């Protein structure tokens, strides 16, 4: 009887010792968080831009939108550069997705640059293009996160943190632009 009990305890101890516990969250969760955050930023940014469309202080709003578009443009370039450097560490499938995202971001940045010169005259159009630039960036990040998540086993471990860092920098600047535009619209 004691021998059977000893064997049972030994088997239980052996099975618990063989279990592997992972402390770090899987990369899949990290990319899902980025995707969710991109959707939230786009929603908030769109709501704020729509709410200031009727502001009485048009000069301040136009200046804030112009400055904001400059800032978003710089961040789009930085995000594109980060994607370029991440491509060197990625595998073939991830490289294709990263290259496509980078090209789409560069196209979005170019569209925003083209609409920049006559801010006073084209404030509404610039606001729309700025909103579209943020939306396109959020969509590209979401699409990229899905692509990388579908190839998690093949994706290099270095890729997810680089993507997250680049996107966090972009989202911080978008939030700063939001604040500045909102402050300009709030001034009476």
UniProtKB/Swiss-Prot annotation:
Keyword Transport included in the entry's annotation: yes
Per the record, the GO terms for biological process are: lipid transport
Any one GO molecular function term: lipid binding
Q: Which residues form the propeptide?
A: 18-22
Q: Which UniProt keywords apply?
A: Cleavage on pair of basic residues, Lipid transport, Secreted, Signal, Transport
Which positions, given as ranges, span the membrane?
none
Coiled coil regions in record: none
Q: What tissues express this gene product?
A: Expressed in fat body and secreted in hemolymph. Also expressed in ovary and testis at lower levels.
Summarize subunit and interaction data from the UniProt record for this chain: Equilibrium between a soluble monomer and a bound lipoprotein form. Apolipophorin-3 associates with lipophorin during lipid loading until each particle contains 9 or 14 molecules of apolipophorin-3.
Please state which protein family the record places this protein in: Belongs to the insect apolipophorin-3 family.
**Purpose of the protein:** Assists in the loading of diacylglycerol, generated from triacylglycerol stores in the fat body through the action of adipokinetic hormone, into lipophorin, the hemolymph lipoprotein. It increases the lipid carrying capacity of lipophorin by covering the expanding hydrophobic surface resulting from diacylglycerol uptake. It thus plays a critical role in the transport of lipids during flight in several species of insects.
Q: What is this protein called?
A: Apolipophorin-3
Upper taxonomic lineage: Eukaryota, Metazoa, Ecdysozoa, Arthropoda, Hexapoda
């Amino acid at each position: 009887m004691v021998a059977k009990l000893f064997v049972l305890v030994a088997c239980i101890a052996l099975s618990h010792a063989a279990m592997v516990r992972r402390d770090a969250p899987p990369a899949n969760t990290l990319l899902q968080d980025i995707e969710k955050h991109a959707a939230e930023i786009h929603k908030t940014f769109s709501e704020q831009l729509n709410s200031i469309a009727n502001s009485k202080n048009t000069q301040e709003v136009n200046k804030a939108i112009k400055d904001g578009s400059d800032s978003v443009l710089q961040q789009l370039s930085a995000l594109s550069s980060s994607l370029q450097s991440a491509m060197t560490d990625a595998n073939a499938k991830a490289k294709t997705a990263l290259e496509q995202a980078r090209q789409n971001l560069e196209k979005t940045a170019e569209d925003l640059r083209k609409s920049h010169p006559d801010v006073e005259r084209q404030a509404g159009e610039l606001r729309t293009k700025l909103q579209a630039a943020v939306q396109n960036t959020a969509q590209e990040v979401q699409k990229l996160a899905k692509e990388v998540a579908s190839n998690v086993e093949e994706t290099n471990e270095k890729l997810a943190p680089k993507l997250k860092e680049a996107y966090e920098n972009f989202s911080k600047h978008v939030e700063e632009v939001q604040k500045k535009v909102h402050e300009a619209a709030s001034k009476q």
